[in-house]
């Protein structure tokens, strides 16, 4: 016993005392830099993603020691900051190094349309320009498919890009976003802007009149689900207590660029629609979630909202713009809510739905940006103005984002129910020279692929013919394919996108997309395994990403099987 005590005492004497706390310690230099950067701010947990943006905007990257300092200042666990920062593709976390310089990132769009126009070769060529200040990386769809291929240099876009144009942009250090001419607040008000919103606010136009107009017009959500707008507004308005409007501007579906087009030309038509929605449900605030790939749009919105506050059209901080950070999954409404709250964009299990328990645990009206864009016109001009624009028995119109092998791509406002052949011939001036129509994506990456022989299907939400074909309209992102395009490569491009953008929360999507891509990269496809994977993902995934990810695969197996060799 004495021997045991003696050994214990000896071991205790040998143990060195710790003179510093455990864990990563904040250094005064970095604490001072972060403190000065955020001087005067009242810190809120839900603004964490914006704090990370501010740090990266200032220093070019997210230094890990700055994150330690941020953790200390806002009293948030470092692990929580790291899990958020590492979730989003646009945040670049680095170890501190004396020879490390802030990086200007050159992102080459690798979406389907850009790939059709040579993005893969362009990416490899641009890699030659890399140095300690320039980093060249691939990036998902940037919402500029009508001017493919696209390259983002810093925050400045080079459209119809080639090596020389990108090199010139880098050499001239032209990294800031270009701001186009657009209808500003003064010009918008001269044309009756905000008069409808004021009439609703003051009771001159009743809520019943607003609801009747929306219902009679047949306006449906333009983000992809096609849920009746009036019904959604009514559901949220019936809840008591605090309520919010959350606008989904995370236009990440490959092939989609309509929202960007509207905001870069007529932002107040959307803002008035959002204001009307807030009056209708009696919202506390309006949160506008905008994808980080749209720096021009973000600047326009911030500038114009400041003007609205100055003219007392809205109270200060009534409209709040939140930047995303490169996560496609945040286009799903509950994932968007999580991101607005400063967390990882993981879709929530439902029920409850966000209409009941949404932003900050309150009833929340979520609308796509374009949906709100048309609200003022429908109320001002009457529901028939919108409803009668449809065709083939459908109401209203769609803003089709058309890209690919057509002569004149772009946003085409065309009747709901129009066919792809009409859209190509009457709105896009036909196929591009030297190209024969082969197939098309009616609704972006997740909407499936149809052959040119099925060119008479009405394009609208709830189109029976479209659903029977295994496809849907989604965000109305139409990509036109020709005889120059290999359908196996097309489907693989789309599945790689879903593999990259899976949030990883559920196994069917996380593992399913990875396994599907591997099987599709084989020379010969294992048809049975691919079908089994597709079925499991569709039935067991938490959200629409995993459920619809294999739609391109299913379409190729069904309509372009002659281009595939099987085991």
Language-model regions: role of each:
Residues 15-106, 110-142, 146-176, 195-216, ...:
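Ferredoxin-type iron-sulfur electron-transfer modules in oxidoreductases and energy-metabolism complexes
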Residues 88, 266-280:
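Histidine-anchored nucleotide/phosphate-binding helix
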Residues 153-155, 403-409, 442-443:
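Short strand-turn-strand beta-turns centered on an Asx-Gly dipeptide
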Residues 188-195, 247-259, 354-359, 401-406:
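Gly-rich Lys/Arg/Thr-decorated short loops/hinges at beta-loop-alpha junctions or inter-strand turns
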Residues 209-243:
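N-terminal glycine-rich phosphate/pyrophosphate-binding loops that anchor nucleotide-derived ligands
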Residues 232, 429-444:
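Short loop-to-beta-strand transition segments
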Residues 273-275, 416-432:
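Short amphipathic, charge-patterned alpha-helical segments
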Residues 298-416, 428-430:
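Hydrophobic alpha-helical positions that pack around
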């Amino acid at each position: 016993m004495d021997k045991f005590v003696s050994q214990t005492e000896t071991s205790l004497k040998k143990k060195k005392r710790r003179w510093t706390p455990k864990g990563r310690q904040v250094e005064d230099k970095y604490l001072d830099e972060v403190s000065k950067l955020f001087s005067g701010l009242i810190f809120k947990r839900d603004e964490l993603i914006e704090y990370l943006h501010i740090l990266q905007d200032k220093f070019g990257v997210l230094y890990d020691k700055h994150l330690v300092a941020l953790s200390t200042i806002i009293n948030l666990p470092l692990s929580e900051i790291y899990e958020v920062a590492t979730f989003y593709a646009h945040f670049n976390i680095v170890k501190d190094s004396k020879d490390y310089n802030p990086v200007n990132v050159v992102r080459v769009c690798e979406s389907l349309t850009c790939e059709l126009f040579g993005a893969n070769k362009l990416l490899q060529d641009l890699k030659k320009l890399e140095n300690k200040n320039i980093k060249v990386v691939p990036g998902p769809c940037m919402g500029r498919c009508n001017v493919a291929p696209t390259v983002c240099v810093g925050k400045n876009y080079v459209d119809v890009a080639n090596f020389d144009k990108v090199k010139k942009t880098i050499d001239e250090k032209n990294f800031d976003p270009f701001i186009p001419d657009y209808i500003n607040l003064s010009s918008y008000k001269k044309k009756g802007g905000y008069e409808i919103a004021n009439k609703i606010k003051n009771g001159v136009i009743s809520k019943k009149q607003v609801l009747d107009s929306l219902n009679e017009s047949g306006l449906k959500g333009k983000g992809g689900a096609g849920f009746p707008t009036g019904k959604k507004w009514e559901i949220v308005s019936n809840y008591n207590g605090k309520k919010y409007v959350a606008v989904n501007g995370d236009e990440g579906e490959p092939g989609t660029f309509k929202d960007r087009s509207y905001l870069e030309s007529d932002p107040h038509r959307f803002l008035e629609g959002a204001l009307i929605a807030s009056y209708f449900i009696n919202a506390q605030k309006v949160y506008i979630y905008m994808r980080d790939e749209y720096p021009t749009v973000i600047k326009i919105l911030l500038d114009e909202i400041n003007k609205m506050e100055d003219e007392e059209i809205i109270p200060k901080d009534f409209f709040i713009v939140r930047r995303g950070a490169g996560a496609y999954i945040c286009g799903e409404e509950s994932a968007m809510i999580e991101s607005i709250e400063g967390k990882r964009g993981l879709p929530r299990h439902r029920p409850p739905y966000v209409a009941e328990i949404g932003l900050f645990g309150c009833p929340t009206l979520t609308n796509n940006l374009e949906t709100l864009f048309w609200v003022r016109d429908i109320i001002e001009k009457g529901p028939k103005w919108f409803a009668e624009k449809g065709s083939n028995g459908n109401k209203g119109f769609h803003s089709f984002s058309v890209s690919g092998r057509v002569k004149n791509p772009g946003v085409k406002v065309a009747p709901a129910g129009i066919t792809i052949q009409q859209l190509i011939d009457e709105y896009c001036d036909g196929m591009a020279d030297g190209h024969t129509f082969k197939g098309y994506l009616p609704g972006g990456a997740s909407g499936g692929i149809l052959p040119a022989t099925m060119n008479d299907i009405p394009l609208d939400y709830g189109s029976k013919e479209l659903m029977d074909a295994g496809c849907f309209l989604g965000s109305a992102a139409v990509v036109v394919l020709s005889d120059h395009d290999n359908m196996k490569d097309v489907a693989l491009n789309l599945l790689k996108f879903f593999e990259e953008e899976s949030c990883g929360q559920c196994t069917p999507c996380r593992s399913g997309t990875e396994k599907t891509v591997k099987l599709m990269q084989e020379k010969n496809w294992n048809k049975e395994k691919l079908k089994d994977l597709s079925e499991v993902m569709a039935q067991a995934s938490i959200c629409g990403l995993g459920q619809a990810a294999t739609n391109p695969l299913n379409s190729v197996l069904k309509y372009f099987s002659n281009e595939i060799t099987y085991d």
